[in-house]
Amino acid sequence: ASTPAADKDLIARCVCIKLNGGLGTSMGLQKAKSLLKIKGEDTFLDLIVRQVKHLRSISGTPVRLLLMNSFSTSADTLAYLEKYAADGFADPAQVELMQNRVPKILADGLSPASCPEQPELEWCPPGHGDLYPALLGSGWLDRLLADGVKYAFVSNSDNLGAQLDMNFLRW
């Protein structure tokens, strides 16, 4: 079935934002959780790319995928996306929204954590609530608005059941 022109216009004004800052450590992976294999050799990230490519296909527009990475997930995610370079998913300037980082605070006394032998352990990502400050502070919000984006579909990178629902866009 073909996609109605009004729906194509709505899809064209949407960005798909995936929260991709978490590591899969509880599942034995020291990389982004989105790089876990979930079916055969396919990862969450492979299926996310397929979902966005499908939206591009049915709308005939370059629907944007934006991954909110953390300092812990950026490098492996971008390296993995190299296999999708021909589809426009490998350029960090086009697909990456970097989450901020905040100092780890010790529960006892609320002072900053100190780890001189591994200073990177003194920092942590602030979590999903950082989406709005990261969009604003990175300049992505202005870029998206300038590109005519009006709607943002946001979900965790490991939630493949969450997909863009045209009923919400039509409302």
Model-predicted regions and their roles:
Residues 2-15, 26-171:
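Domain-scale recognition of functional cores that engage charged ligands
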